[in-house]
Amino acid sequence: MSPVIIHVPHASTVIPKKIAEHLLISGKELQHELDLMTDGLTDELASRASKRATMKPWIFENKLSRLVFDPERFPDETEVMNQVGMGVVYSMTSDQKPLRDISIAESQKIIDHYFNPYSAALQSLVKERLEAIGQVVIIDLHSYPAVPSDYELYKESARPALCLGVDDFHTSENLVALARNAFSGLGDIDINSPFVGTYVPLAFYGKDPRVQSIMLEIRRDTFLTAGIPSQGFEPTAAAIADLLDALSLKSDEAGSER
């Protein structure tokens, strides 16, 4: 069994009507924001890579836009993106204009209705896989634009073809090496630049080293042109599949040693 869960948090553009009617932007302005903030076709990359892989991973996908809620934020004051109005429930747009006029109580309702059940479901899947095979590797799949957005905290950082987001506790040197090897032919690779860290469910964060995680932030112009797959799409999916196969092989080797 594959130890891998591909997490696809930002691929959807779906915004429920009851959420959309409280946003301060609509029409072309909202579509522009979705174009900027959606990790377009990362869901298709995950699906294509899964089909290519020898051992199929689990895919956990957010079916709602990150403008509804962002599953990868900390739901408290420790979230650094709160400073730009982009915690779990965004109050500002990517160019730092108002997105919502929302109270703390209203924000908490969204957290309770969307964020908490989502987090609990992913946490349950990780727990289930740990009980089944004793290890989990989360591939946190994202894409990002070639030009920095106003909300970004590290606008001056390099913007490589691939940013590997790592965590000191949950990302081993071996996992980084496997990712580097899988993507070695697709351009330059940096660590934690321009985005830092990787997703781990809060119940395991900083506590269980059996949960490994690495973020793949793929620069959009390497596989998309105006939101449409380019000639780089299939090689990118193939690289993800190569990483899946390498992780499954390592898992099999570890299992045979136990």
Regions found by a protein language model. Name each.
Residues 1-138, 143-257:
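N-terminal catalytic or cofactor-binding beta/alpha core of small enzyme domains
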